[in-house]
Amino acid sequence: MPRRREVPKRVVLPDPKYKEEVIAKFANVMMRDGKKSTAEKIVYGALEMVAERSKSDALEIFRKAIDNVRPVVEVKSRRVGGATYQVPVEIRSDRRMALAMRWLRDSARKRNEKSMGNRLAAEILEAAENRGNAVRKREETHRMAEANKAFAHFRW
């Protein structure tokens, strides 16, 4: 974090196929070793599979999945008088989106399907139905915040 001035946010250009910033951002999250075209192929393939399996708009299902995974509160560690407390704090909207995408990617990577496209498609479909590991991760985060609600007055 620079001290002098705030660093401007980079503008993410919409993806070429769906003309959506969300998809472009997700492709960037999926990218490994700077291989953007590979990441885009995986994301587009997964979205096609989602459309095939659900017989409806893949983009809508993807948005619903992201919304279901997006957390509202998280806990941050705060030292107060020698003790470390897990203080629940509300999450900024851009961080909510970033966390949701990261959790979706990580849960897809942990699955056992053959290709990454299959894994991602399955995870997106489950997340859209409020199931799956990514949704479980959000629930866990909310549970932690709820359990530590007593320390909310330590917020900074």
Curated annotation (Swiss-Prot):
PROSITE patterns attached to this UniProt entry: RIBOSOMAL_S7
One Pfam family here: Ribosomal_S7
Domain of life per record: Bacteria
GO cellular component, as recorded: small ribosomal subunit
GO molecular function: rRNA binding; structural constituent of ribosome; tRNA binding
Alphabetical UniProt keywords: Ribonucleoprotein, Ribosomal protein, RNA-binding, rRNA-binding, tRNA-binding
GO biological process: translation
InterPro entries: Ribosomal_uS7, Ribosomal_uS7_bac/org-type, Ribosomal_uS7_CS, Ribosomal_uS7_dom, Ribosomal_uS7_dom_sf
Similarity section: Belongs to the universal ribosomal protein uS7 family.
Assembly and oligomerization: Part of the 30S ribosomal subunit. Contacts proteins S9 and S11.
Function summary: One of the primary rRNA binding proteins, it binds directly to 16S rRNA where it nucleates assembly of the head domain of the 30S subunit. Is located at the subunit interface close to the decoding center, probably blocks exit of the E-site tRNA.
UniProt-recorded name of the protein: Small ribosomal subunit protein uS7
